[in-house]
Amino acid sequence: MAQHGDGKQYMELDQSKGTEMRNKALMDNNMLLETFIQMSEKGRLSSNYMTVTAIVRDVEQESFAFASECGILDVSQKMLKNFKSLCAILRSIRPDASSNNAFAYWKEVICKWLCATLLSTRPDAGSDDGFAYWKEVIWKTKQEFRAKYPFPETPFAANKVDDVNTHSPKFVMEFIDAVVGNLNVLVKINDPSSLLFVPGPNEQTEQVLKELKLLRFFVCFVSNKCIEPQYRRTTFYTHALIEASHITMVVWLHFPIYGNGNQDLNPGDVSRLLSDFMEMKIKSIQLGISRNNIYIDVLKALKSTIPQAQNKHAAESGIEETPTHNLMVGLSDQMANLREMICLLRDNLIHLPILDLEFHVQDMDSVIVDAGLLFYSLYDIKGEKEDKTLEDINQALGFDIPRNIEPIKAMVYLVMQKAFQSNLPRIHGLGYVDFLLKNLKDFQGRYSDSLAFLKNQLQVIQTEFESLQPFLKVVVEEPHNRLKTLNEDCATQIIRKAYEVEYVVDACINKEVPQWCIERWLLDIIEEITCIKANIQEKNTVEDTMKTVIGRTSSQLTRTPRMNEEIVGFEDVIENLRKKLLNGTKGQDVISIHGMPGLGKTTLANRLYSDRSVVSQFDICAQCCVSQVYSYKELLLALLCDAVGEDSARRELPDNELADMFRKTLLPRRYLILVDDVWENSAWDDLRGCFPDVNNRSRIILTTRHHEVAKYASVHSDPLHLRMFGEDESWKLLEKKVFGEERCSPLLKNVGLRIAKMCGRLPLSIVLVAGILSEMEKEVECWEQVANNLGSHIHNDSRAIVDQSYHVLPFHLKSCFLYFGAFLEDRVINVSRLIRLWISESFIKSCEGRRLEDIAEGYLENLIGRNLVMVTQRANSDGKVKACRLHDVLLDFCKERAAEENFLLRIKWDQSTKPSSCVYSHKQHAHLAFTGMDNLLEWSTSGSLVGSVLFKNYDPNFAYNSCSSHAFAISRILPNFKFLKVLDLEHQFFIDFIPTELLYLRYLSARIGQNSIPSSISNLWNLETLILKDVRYMRRCRLLQPNTVWDMVKLRHLHIPYFSTEKEEALLENSAKLYDLETLSTPYFFRVENAELMLRKTPNLRKLICAIECLEYPPQYHVLNFPITLEILKLYRSSDFKVIPFCISAQNLKYLKLSGFYLNSQYLSETADHLKHLEVLKLHNIEFGGHSEWEVSNAKFPQLKILKLEYVSLMKLIVADDAFPNLEQLVLHDCEDLMEIPSCFMDILSLKYIEVDNCSESVVKSARNIQETQVEDSQNNNFKLVIVKKMVLKFDTSNEKEISKAFDRLLSLPGIQSIAVDSNEKKFIVIGDMDADEVRLVVGKLINRGML
C-alpha cells in the first residue's frame, strides 16, 4: 500500500524526460485498466448497477487492500511484476525503442497487447475494436456510478467483517496515508499532456485531502489517548475506514479513462462529485447511528479518560488540527467566535516548544475535547431548527456554552502568549524601549480607529515605559553596580514586555488576534510592568543602605601557581620587557600587558617574574592574582606572604592595617610585584596605594584583558598589547608540547605545520590541540583526523575562556558583541555600517544630548579595549576606528552563543538545518543571516517574528551575477517577515522592487536595477537608513527619486547613487524638514538654488556627497551656506562646465574633497576664510588657473592636518610660513607638473608624513630635503617619507629568457618595489623609491649587451 512519499513516481511528465518517464505514465494508467480486466475475467463487470455494487462488496470482503487499489492509483506488487515482464518482452522485440520518438510506438504496442488479453475474454471483439469496446464498458460503468451511487451501506457498517486488523488504528492510518498519497499525485499533476492529468480546478481535491489528513490526525489522537472498551473505538475506526474508502471511489469516478483525456468528464461534473462529498451526502453509516454521534461518543470517552491518558505531546498526534475537522459546515453564527479561538490555538501550537507546553498537556487535551463536543453537538441541532436561540442550544445540549467557552479562551490566550514569548531572544538591546515609545505615539495617530478601544491601556503602558527609562540608563552607565544581576534581569523583562506590546498592537491593527485576547494581554502586561517597577524600587531602597564597595569580599582569592616552565615564542617581547624592568626611569614604573584571552599574558608575566637575571636585581618579589571577583584582604595576605612569609595571625587584622604593614615592608627596598588578571580600574585603585615610589627603580608587572585598565595603570611605560603568535612560533610551541625535548618526525611535520596554522596563532588553542595530539599515536592518519576535525574541537575547548569574557560584559554590550556572528570569517567590517546596523537593531540606548552614533562608537571602543574586537584601520585625522574584525575563535563563539540565546542564526548555503527540523525548539530567531537565496525561501514561512534578515556572500561578484528570479522570489516572501526591522541585501543580489509593506523596517540596503524609486517608499515611515547601490555602477545613470522620500522624517542616512528629485523646487518648498538626516549621498543638482533648498530642509546634516551641474553661463557666483553641523563634504563635477558656481561656507567643516573642477588661488582663498576648522583637504583631478599656481597665505588653514593632491595640474605651490601650522600629512599623487614642495614644510613641527607618488624628480628631491631637516635638525624622529615612482622602460627583444634576465637585474636595484611586464607593448612598468639615473644606467648597459 502506498505511503506519503510513494507519489513521486506519478509526478508530471515531460517529453524531454525520455522513454523511461513515459513508460511510468503508461504503467500507471494501464495498471488501472488491468485491474478491471481481471475483474471482467471473473465475470464481475457489467452495465448493471447492482452487479457493480456487489462487485465492490465482494472485493471488500476478499481483500480490503485490493479494493483500495481498484479505486486509486497505487499498483500492487503482482501487477508491477507483470508489467516489468511485459517491458522485458517489449525491449527484446524493439531494442531501439529507448529514444524519445518511440513514445507512440510503445503506446500502440501496449494497447495491442491489452487488446489481445481482452480478446481472450471476449472472442467476438475484433482485434481492431477490442480495446475501444472495453474502454466503452468502463466509461459506461462510471456513468452509472455517477448517476446512481449513493454511498451505500457496506459490510463494515454492519460489523460483518470479523478481521480484527481492519479495526486497528494502525491499519486505518496506513489506509488513509495511502489514499492521501495517491490524491497528492492528482493535485500535483498540472501538465495537460500527462496521461494522469485531471482537468478542472484542484481546490476541492485539496480540500478533500485536508479533510482526510484531519481525519487521520483524529484517529491518531484517539488511539493515543482513549482507553475505553474496544467496541467504542471499533465504531469510530470503522467510520474512518468507510469515509476513506468512499473517497477512493470518488477519485476513480472522476479519473480519466485511458485515451479519453479531457473529454471523459468535464470540470463541472468533477466539481459536483466532490461537492457532494464535501456536503456530507453520507448521512449515516448504519440505521440509527448518526455520524456526529460517533464523534460525540468517542469524545466523551476521551474526556472520561484524559487524567489517566499517556502524557504525550499534543503536536505529535496532530491535535492542533483536530478541532477544525469537518467543522466548516454546520457552525452556527453563535459559534463563529469558538471556531476563531480553535484556529488560533492550532496556529500557535506549532510555534510552541515542547518544554513550554508539557506542563499544560492534560489541560490542552481537555479543552480540545470540550470544543469538539460543542462542535459535533451543534451539527445535530442545526439540522433540527435554524432559529434556535443560545438558551435553546444550552438546554438541548445540557450545558452552558458561554461558561464552557471560558476555559477554551483561557487556554487559547495562554498558548498564544507562550508561543510568542518562547520565540523571543534572551539577549536584547536596551534601545528597544526607545523605538517602542516612538512607535506607540505614531501608531495611535495613524491607526486611531483600530486602536480606539485600547486607548487607555496604551496610554498607561506608554507612561509606565517612560518611567522606566531612568532605570535603563543606570543599567548602561553603571554596569558594575552591586545589583548588576538584578538590574540586568529587570532590564530583560522590560524589553520582553516591549516586544509583546509591539506584537499585540500590530495584531490589533491587522485584526489578527480577537479583541478579547488583546485586552486581556495588555492588562497582563500592565500588571507585569507594575511588578517589575516594584521589584526595582524595593531593591534600590535596600541598596541605598549598603556600602558600594564592589566585590571585595565576595569570593576567596584565586592564587596563581608559580610557573618555571620554559616559554616558547615571544622572544622579542621578553627581551623588550626585560629591558624595561631592569633599566628605564628611576621612579616606579608599571609594565602593563594586555590582550585577548588565551594569548599567554600570565605565562609571559610569570616567565619574567621567575627570570633569575631579573629577580636578582630586586630586594622583594611578591605576586597576587586579582581575578574578576576578589577579596581585598586575601590580596594583601598573599602579597605579605611572599614578602615576609606566612603568619596566620595576620588574618585577624583589619584591611587597613594589613595594607599599612605591606607598604612599610616595601618602603625602603626595591621591589618587583606581579599583579595578574586585573579586570577593572577599581581593583587597581585598591592596590596602588600599597606600592610606594621612592625613586629606586621598583617595578610592577600588571596583566589584564582590557586596554582601558592597562592604560589607566600605566605610569611611564606605554601598555604592551601582546601580539598573536607567528606561524613559526605556533609550530615551535606545538612541537615542544607534543614531543618535549625530542624533535617531530619528518613524516608528521607537514600535517603538524598545518595543524599549528589552523590554531589561529592563539597560544591557548595550540596548547589544547597539543594535549590531544600527545594522547594519540604518532601516525600520519591520526594527525590527519585531528586536522580534519580541528575547527570544532579547538573552538569548543577554548570556548570557556571566551565565555568568561562574555559573561562579564555589561548588559548593553552583549547584543553588540554577539551581532558580529552575522559577519563572515576573515572579513574586515566597515564601522560606519556596523554602527548603523546596531542603531537600527535598537542595541544603542539613547542619552539626552548625545548622538546615537557617538554612543555606539563608545560601545565599540569598549569592546576593543576588552580585546574582543581587533582594529584594522583608524582614521588619520581623528584616530576614530574605520574598520575592525574578530578573531575566528571569537567569531565562532558569537555564532554559537547567539544561536543558543535565540538571538541570531547564521545559515550557510550548504547547511542542512531547516526550519522544519527545529520547529519545536527555536522556531524563530531575532536575526537571521543567510549566504544563499534558497535558505531564505526555506525559512520564509517561519519568519513572522524575525527582526533582521542579513545576506552575506563569500563571492564578492555574486551581486552582479544574480538573476531576476531571485528578485522575484524575494519580493513574494518578504511580506512573511512582517516585523522586519533590518533588511540587508547589499552583498547578495540586486532587486527590482522596494518592500514597502514592511512598516517596521529601519534599515534597508540593496542593489537596484531600475531607473526610479516608487513613491510608495514613504510607507516605510520607520526607515532610518536607506542605502541603494546601482548595479549599473559603470554607467553613472541618474536615478529618479520620488518627492515622497522627503516626507520620511525619521531618515538618518540616505545613500542613493546620483539621484535627482521630481519637481525639485515645488517639492523642497512644500516638504517637511528632515531634522534627523545626518548623511546624504549622492544628490545631483542642476541649479544652485535647488542645493540651497535642500540644505534648508536638512539642518542637521553632518556628511554630504553631491554632484553639481551648472546650466547657467556665466554661473551665478555666490556663497552657499551649509548647515553648521556639516563635517564632511565631497563635491563632484557632473558636466563639462568645470567651475564651482558657489563659494563653500561651512564653519564646522572638517573634511573637504573637490573632484573634477577648475580652481584658482582666489577661489580657494575665499573658501578657506569660511572653513577655519578644516582638518582634511583633498583635491582630485583639479585644473588650476592663473599660471597653474596655488598661493596660500598665512593662517588660511589653521587646523588643517592632511593635504592630499591627486592628479592636480599644478606647477607651483606657493605657501606662506604659517599657512599650515598644524599639518601632519602631505600626499602628492600623480602631480606630474609640480616643480617642488615649498621649503617652508621643513619648519612645520607637526609634520609626520610625506608621500610622493609618481611625481617629478624635483619634487622627490625637495621631499628628501624636508626629511633631512625634519629628522636631523628638528629631531622629528616620527617623520616618515614614502617615495613611490613609476618609470616606463621600453624594450625591443621578444626573447623571454632575455626579458627575464633584465627583469631580475632591475628588481635587484635598491628601492624597487615592483615591476610589471607588458609583453604586448614591450615595456617594463617600474614602481618604487629608486634612483632614476641609476635605473637608466642599468637599462643602458642591458641595451648595450643586447639584452633589451
From Swiss-Prot:
Q: Does the keyword Flavoprotein apply?
A: no
Keywords for this protein: ATP-binding, Coiled coil, Cytoplasm, Hypersensitive response, Leucine-rich repeat, Membrane, Nucleotide-binding, Plant defense, Repeat
Q: What does the record say about its membrane topology?
A: Peripheral membrane protein
Q: Mind telling me which CDD domains this protein's record contains?
A: RX-CC_like (cd14798)
The processes (GO biological process) annotated in the record are:
plant-type hypersensitive response
GO molecular function, a single term: metal ion binding
Q: Which Pfam families match?
A: NB-ARC, NB-LRR, WH_DRP
Residue ranges annotated as coiled coil are: 446-469, 561-583
The protein's predominant localisation is cytoplasm
Q: Which amino acid positions bind ATP, per UniProt?
A: G595, M596, P597, G598, L599, G600, K601, T602
Sum up the protein's function in the record's words.
Confers resistance to late blight (Phytophthora infestans) races carrying the avirulence gene Avr1. Resistance proteins guard the plant against pathogens that contain an appropriate avirulence protein via an indirect interaction with this avirulence protein. That triggers a defense system including the hypersensitive response, which restricts the pathogen growth.
Note the PANTHER family from the entry: AAA+ ATPASE DOMAIN-CONTAINING PROTEIN (PTHR23155:SF1152), DISEASE RESISTANCE PROTEIN RP (PTHR23155)
| Additional note from the record | This protein is encoded by the haplotype B genome of the allohexaploid Solanum demissum.
Question: What family does the entry list?
Answer: Belongs to the disease resistance NB-LRR family.
Q: What is this protein called?
A: Putative late blight resistance protein homolog R1B-12
Could you tell me the gene encoding this protein?
R1B-12
